[in-house]
Amino acid sequence: MIYLHIGGGVGDLDSSTNYRDGFSEFVKSKNDKNKKIFIVEANPANIKKLKRSWKNFKNVKIINIAITKNNVGKKIFYYSEKDAPHYQLFSSKKTCYETLSRFYN
């Protein structure tokens, strides 16, 4: 079985979600030794915790990229340090980021 999670965040290590993540819970509960897991996360600030979340699973590939409808090469993303340490607010559109970041002021 192949599992793909787009937008992995920090997996099940986010205290703001009570350390729960539906994808992580579902996949980790499956007793399938042949499963392959691909997790895509655009925010590099989340990768270290995401790797820690999946450290006991050998068939996991964590990919630090953003997925877009067009091949745009490098892209600037906006996030707020006030949203640390899990950075739920993350956008490629500055106007969207500015609107949402008001919740953290």
Regions found by a protein language model. Give the residues of each.
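Phosphate/nucleotide-binding beta-alpha loop and adjacent structural elements of enzyme active sites
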Residues: 1-105
